[in-house]
A protein has these predicted regions:
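Single conserved hydrophobic/aromatic residue that forms the stacking wall/gate
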Residues: 1-2, 180, 184-195
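Amphipathic alpha-helical segments in well-structured domains
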Residues: 3, 42-45, 49, 137, ...
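Short alpha-helical segments and helix-capping/turn motifs at coil-helix boundaries
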Residues: 3-4, 92-94, 144-148
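Internal, glycine-rich beta/alpha segment that forms the wall or movable "lid"
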Residues: 8-123, 151, 155-156, 165, ...
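Flexible loop residues that form catalytic
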Residues: 112, 132, 187
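Glycine-rich nucleotide phosphate-binding loop and flanking beta-alpha elements
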Residues: 115, 134-135, 190
Length: 195
């Protein structure tokens, strides 16, 4: 798996942004005539993440001995086949590369729908969000954090990363004027800050 190789090369600094796009162009890139409906994309994402994590776990942490003197490269007793047969995927495994340095790369999910928040609550270390108001952001935070307990996770195991578009001015008035100008050319609401 190329991604796992990148994680090794970077010393465990790679992250995986799990995207369940609704783009019809993306569907065509994967041999699909039409894109699956929203809910089905998230069901598929849950299974896909399970498969990928299972493949990452196919080698135990200490499976690779790499002893040149004895020519003992790896311990075959510490390799496991995945043998996953699910609704969308059938994968035997194992991978042909060691576990990532930190176990798994950081998993990021960016979805504000109920399905997206559920996927993040079950699988992600980070969720990206772009709420329009402070009140919406606080409600999102509380909602997504409350989903972790049913998966045996604590609120500390999921970081919420808000999308912020700062507009800076010498005064608050300058920032608001810049914000107004920018809003005319953007479909995103922007919060003003003065320095």
């Amino acid at each position: 798996m190329l991604f796992r190789s990148l994680d090794h090369i970077s010393g465990g600094r790679a992250g995986w942004n799990v995207v369940t796009t609704g783009s019809s162009e993306a569907a065509g890139n994967f041999g699909l005539e039409a894109h699956p409906i929203h809910a089905e994309r998230y069901i598929r994402a849950h299974e896909f993440i399970d498969v990928v994590k299972g493949l990452w776990d196919s080698w135990e942490d200490d499976a690779f001995v790499r002893d040149q003197e004895t020519a003992f490269y790896y311990d075959p007793n510490k390799i496991h086949q995945l043998n996953h047969k699910g609704r969308f995927f059938s994968v035997r495994g194992p991978l042909n590369i060691a576990r990532p340095p930190q176990g798994y790369p950081v998993i990021v999910q960016a979805g504000s729908s109920q399905d997206g928040k559920e996927l993040a609550g079950r699988t992600a270390e980070v969720i990206f969000t772009a709420q329009q108001t402070l009140e919406d952001a606080q409600a999102f935070y509380t909602d997504v954090k409350s989903r972790l307990a049913k998966y045996g996770r604590t609120p500390e195991q999921l970081k919420v990363m808000p999308g912020v578009f700062p507009v800076v001015g010498l005064t608050e008035g300058d920032a608001k004027a810049d914000r107004k100008s920018t809003r005319l050319n953007s479909s995103h609401q922007i919060i003003s800050y003065a320095v």
